[in-house]
């Protein structure tokens, strides 16, 4: 029986899962939006939500806890400076998961996970062009 066994193994060892989630959390905080498989998105969401809550706490111990989890000081400083101040008044629910079809090679369900009030410029020039094109299309319609 699997009573009380939460979380997905994602066909990886525990150390591989831990490293993958650390890398995914760092990428999500840096770019504020990533495309991944739906199960991975569902697993990374509570990890990043807890990191944002640590960022809102803002003290040295919280910063060290965040560094121990995602191991990238530049990303942690963005988390504590930019992202934590953006969500200072929001109590949870910092991320959204949107289904994004299926991957071409193996038909795996894809999802876009992003911050709710994300900074469009964080993703890069390609995303900025897409967002501006969508805005122009909505304006024309």
Swiss-Prot record:
The organism of origin for this protein: Rhizobium meliloti (strain 1021)
GO BP annotation list: translation
Alphabetized PANTHER family for the sequence: LARGE RIBOSOMAL SUBUNIT PROTEIN BL17M (PTHR14413:SF16), RIBOSOMAL PROTEIN L17 (PTHR14413)
Any one of the GO CC terms: cytosolic large ribosomal subunit
Protein keywords: Ribonucleoprotein, Ribosomal protein
Family annotation (InterPro entries): Ribosomal_bL17, Ribosomal_bL17_CS, Ribosomal_bL17_sf
Protein name: Large ribosomal subunit protein bL17
SUPFAM superfamilies the UniProt entry points to: Prokaryotic ribosomal protein L17
Quaternary structure (record): Part of the 50S ribosomal subunit. Contacts protein L32.
Highest taxon in the source lineage: Bacteria
GO molecular function per UniProt: structural constituent of ribosome
The family this protein is said to belong to: Belongs to the bacterial ribosomal protein bL17 family.
HAMAP family xref list: Ribosomal_bL17
